[in-house]
Amino acid sequence: MSTLTPFPLLALIGAVSGAVTAWVLLRRDRPAQVLTPSAPPEPMPDGVTARLLADEREARLDALRSLAEEADEDPGLRQDCVDEVLAQFRTDPHAPLWELLREHLRRDSPRFWPGMDLHVVFGLLADVDLRGCEVRDGVFRTVGFAGDAHFEDTVFTGKVNFEESCFARHALFDRARFEAGANFEHTTFTGTAAFPGITTHGRTWFDAARFSARTDFAAAGFGDGVSFGGVGFSGPTTFRDARFAAVALFGQARFGGHADFTGAVAAAFEFAGARVRTDVHVVHTWPDGVTAGEPAPRHPGRWAELR
């Protein structure tokens, strides 16, 4: 076989070699290129940013309103809609959505959705307004309530849990009904805690709660056992005309202000280890058979043990 390279192949090699040589010469003769980072984009004016955020917020609110309209026709979407509204509060605590919820949680509303659950854990809720609503479970564990929290005439047909929550202003539960008990253990009430005329069925706990201002349980009706063990009542406190169907437990409680149990009735009152402050000008009216012992210095002030 011949070892001579065919002419066409030699021509192809020459052409490629020439092209490469020309490219090298061209790159050598061009000035060096210096790469500089591009300048950061100009920030948007504050007014534009605020408008975009407002538009985005309004779009989300409109989507929730549309979902509520769909849920009116499809009951299977109703709990999802309620959950989405509560999720919106996580990123936008002041969202104007309480009116939307009330429209669907009030029994006298033509758009009432029965059997809805409210479930919020470790969040912030502002200006809560559930007046006259009826829900099944109400779980608000470790929630911070900013502004007044309105639960007047609210009916809870299932479990209720406010454990370790904090009310920064007034907590208003006038005439609320807890049909399966409630848990307010370790809850902090910074402003007025108003529970006049409430009714409970099932065990109810306020153990280790802190009431910093006026506390009102006047005419409350506790259908089963209730415990205020270790509670701190710093302001004026009233249980006037309250009704306890079982033993009312106030063991280790602290009463730092006025205390009024006039007309309160229980199967028995237990105040073991409870104390009342005696070095401030306050008035105390205890249930029959309950008296204060000799005052003793304790930080702060002087306290007497109830017995």
Short names for language-model regions:
Residues 1-40:
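Membrane-embedded hydrophobic alpha-helical segments
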Residues 42-307:
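N-terminal leader/targeting and pre-domain segments
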